[in-house]
């Protein structure tokens, strides 16, 4: 009996260790890469212009993790002035949830925060914004809302949402589990088949109709010609890393990645996010491409950061 108990205990410990492997990943950015390598994917963007004036609303909230993780205010302070360097773009900020006037003005809302418990009226405002033609880019924890019975309403606005700790999952990932992209989708057309990051994602999310998964974390494949459809069937795949969604006249582009602050200083990650922004707005991505290099290109033409950026004190506003 004792022997059986010991075997059972060892098996349980093995499962716990396996489940915890991702959480033991050491936070570390990718090495900077030459600018000419990135331009292969940005394409030429000199003198590229948007087709119209774009009003962006950046939704943020209090930072809720240790420094370097879920730095909602820090990332807002990085991206808002950067986006405003794009001709014909203006950016407004909203804390926790927009007013109706802000929704009325916005062409695109970018959300990076842990959402509060929204009221039915607020969900109606949000859904009407999307269905009426508004665009949304949802980053990382923005797909989570509590109490969890509100998750279906959130999914109606952005396509996917956290189902609760029993049904949805989270974990860190690194080089052994690349981010695979559906690079025949318009948002990612012409990009690499896979990108390596050292970050965190969620998977097994609640999905609405009209969701298309276009990015997934999976064990590294030796087959360079493996299709994205086959990646989604891989054992151990973490789908829902990136998705697109349409509801009414609106578009949403979502990701469960973007946990660490240094990830936003990675040129390939910026490129992916900016592609999503352009797709959601039905705009050519070229006018946004200078931001891939903005503030992270050194004198030798290397783009990125070597700073893990963990030495930071969280703020509430």
Please provide the spans of the model-predicted regions.
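Sec-dependent N-terminal signal peptides
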Residues: 4-13
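Boundary at the C-terminal end of the N-terminal hydrophobic targeting segment
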Residues: 16-19
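Extracellular ligand-binding/catalytic regions of CAZymes and related secreted enzymes
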Residues: 21-51, 223-317
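Helical hinge/lid and interdomain linker segments adjacent to catalytic or ligand-binding clefts
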Residues: 24-27, 68-146
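Catalytic beta-strand/loop cores that center a nucleophilic Ser/Cys/Thr
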Residues: 33-42, 169-248
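Extracellular/periplasmic catalytic domains that process cell-envelope and extracellular macromolecules
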Residues: 48-53, 84, 101-105, 119-120, ...
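Short beta-strand segments enriched in small/hydrophobic residues
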Residues: 53-64
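A glycine-rich, often tryptophan-bearing local segment used as a flexible ligand/cofactor-contacting loop or short
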Residues: 116-191
């Amino acid at each position: 009996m004792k022997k059986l108990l010991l075997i059972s205990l060892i098996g349980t410990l093995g499962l716990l260790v396996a489940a915890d492997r991702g959480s033991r990943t050491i936070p570390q950015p990718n090495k900077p890469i030459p600018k000419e390598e990135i331009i292969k994917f940005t394409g030429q963007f000199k003198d590229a212009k948007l087709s119209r004036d774009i009003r962006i609303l950046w939704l943020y909230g209090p930072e809720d993790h240790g420094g370097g993780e879920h730095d909602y205010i820090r990332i807002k302070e990085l991206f808002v002035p950067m986006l405003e360097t794009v001709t014909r773009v203006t950016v407004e900020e909203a804390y926790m949830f927009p007013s109706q006037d802000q929704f009325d003005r916005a062409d695109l809302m970018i959300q990076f925060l842990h959402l509060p418990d929204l009221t039915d009226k607020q969900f109606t405002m949000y859904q009407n914004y999307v269905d009426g033609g508004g665009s949304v880019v949802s980053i990382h924890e923005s797909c989570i809302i509590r109490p969890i019975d509100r998750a279906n309403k959130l999914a109606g606005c952005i396509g996917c949402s956290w189902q609760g700790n029993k049904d949805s999952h989270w974990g860190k990932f690194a080089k052994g589990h690349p981010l695979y992209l559906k690079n025949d989708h318009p948002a990612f057309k012409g990009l690499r088949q896979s990108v390596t990051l050292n970050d965190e994602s969620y998977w097994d999310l609640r999905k609405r109709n009209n969701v298309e998964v276009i990015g997934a974390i999976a064990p590294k494949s030796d087959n360079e010609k493996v299709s994205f459809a086959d990646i989604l069937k891989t054992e151990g795949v973490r789908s829902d890393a990136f998705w697109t969604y349409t509801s009414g006249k609106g578009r949403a582009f979502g990701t469960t990645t973007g946990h660490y602050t240094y990830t936003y200083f990675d040129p390939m990650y910026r490129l992916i996010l900016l592609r999503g922004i352009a797709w959601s707005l039905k705009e050519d991505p070229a006018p946004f491409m200078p931001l891939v290099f903005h503030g992270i290109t050194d004198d030798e033409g290397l783009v990125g950061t070597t700073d893990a950026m963990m030495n930071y004190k969280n703020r509430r506003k």
